[in-house]
Amino acid sequence: MKEKFFELKVLSRKSDVLKEFAFELGATCIEEIENGFILRDEDDLSNISWGLEEFAGRIGSDISTSLEIKDNIDWINEYKKGIKPVSSGKFYIRPSWEEQKDGFIDIIIDPALAFGSGHHESTSSCLNLISKYINLKECKIALDVGCGSGILSIALAKLGLAVDACDTDEQAVLSSTDNARKNGIKFNNIWTGSITDANGRYDVVVANIISDVILLLSKDLKMHVNNNGYLILSGILTKYKDRILQAFGDLELVWNITQNEWESFIFKNKDKNGK
């Protein structure tokens, strides 16, 4: 570990769009703050700062950036302090150093630097959709595509479903497995890869990933949903909403949640007899 690290603070009214672009530029550690976000890395973030400023100019967005060099020992503690519990639907998501809350299904997530802790709109919406529509009476087995920290997989498992999970990032698979262990959960199967490596069909398929990948995998996502099963899609910017609705128009749209510039959908794969 290096003695110093770079911290880039970005403020903008279009912080969600800029944050997504920051990931495309190679950012791995992002902390959300009011009206913006903070990037941290042991490598110089000057190029990412420049790229964000250029992108903001092209889309007509305001932006304010500040880059500092800090001691590594400080930012680890600051990062922990910045991660607070959050409730979404039936679930209460907390880091292990916080207490659980009565009346909620408890989920412990100690977030890795690149993966979710439940605070983002897309994750929160997924948890709300799972809370409202997914139950053991209808659903027995689920697949989480792009599992990240494993938060959605763990939520489904806490409801009693057998869960498969996958991610193209090996570190995400390790993070999900570790978080599952902390929650007393064991996945039915977890692998490094995507839905194209899945066998069989599921009562619930969840994909909280970027819009382009959802569209690319649209046929595979639909193919792996059982008759009368559910498909939950999230991580979608509003500008892609119409394209998503068109690509999945052969499924029944059950509900759509919009939070700021993020869209989440739950579809049902009605069987041929409409039962």
From Swiss-Prot:
It is found in: Cytoplasm. GO terms for molecular function: protein-lysine N-methyltransferase activity. S-adenosyl-L-methionine binds at residues 123, 146, 167, 208. It comes from the Bacteria. Its EC number is 2.1.1.-. It catalyses: L-lysyl-[protein] + 3 S-adenosyl-L-methionine = N(6),N(6),N(6)-trimethyl-L-lysyl-[protein] + 3 S-adenosyl-L-homocysteine + 3 H(+). Its main location: cytoplasm. InterPro entries: Ribosomal_L11_MeTrfase_PrmA, Ribosomal_PrmA_MeTrfase, SAM-dependent_MTases_sf. HAMAP family: Methyltr_PrmA. Belongs to the methyltransferase superfamily. PrmA family. PANTHER family: ELECTRON TRANSFER FLAVOPROTEIN BETA SUBUNIT LYSINE METHYLTRANSFERASE. This is Ribosomal protein L11 methyltransferase. It comes from Campylobacter fetus subsp. fetus (strain 82-40). The gene is prmA.
